[in-house]
Design a protein with these regions (language model features):
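Recognition helix of helix-turn-helix/homeodomain-like DNA-binding domains
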Residues: 46, 71-78
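Short, amphipathic alpha-helical "recognition" segments used to contact nucleic acids or chromatin
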Residues: 39-54
């Protein structure tokens, strides 16, 4: 199986989750507690960047997240062509 195929399989596994609880249980099995903490932090940073007009330093002080993490999330939110974060925010706006 090629590396790309493994990524598709993981994405399909997430699509098979029928509820928020299914996703949480899958993540608990798939990730270490530290990885889950990192994912939650990134998502919180992303929401803060998207909805609030705060500097990186203000976000760091508010959330206790490293400036490196904030910068990485901001780059993917604003500059990267994956549009993963933007796609989710667009879908949230539709509901």
């Amino acid at each position: 199986m090629k590396n790309h195929d493994k990524n598709i399989s993981l994405a399909k596994a997430f699509l098979l989750c029928k509820s928020e609880q299914d996703v949480e249980n899958f993540l608990l099995d798939l990730c270490t507690p530290s990885e889950i903490k990192d994912l939650k932090e990134r998502w919180l940073v992303c929401q803060t960047l998207y909805y609030e007009e705060l500097s990186y330093r203000q976000i760091h002080q508010k959330l206790g997240v490293s400036l490196t993490t904030i910068g990485r999330v901001a780059r993917f939110l604003k500059d990267e062509k994956n549009f993963g974060y933007k796609n989710i925010f667009n879908k949230l706006g539709e509901n």
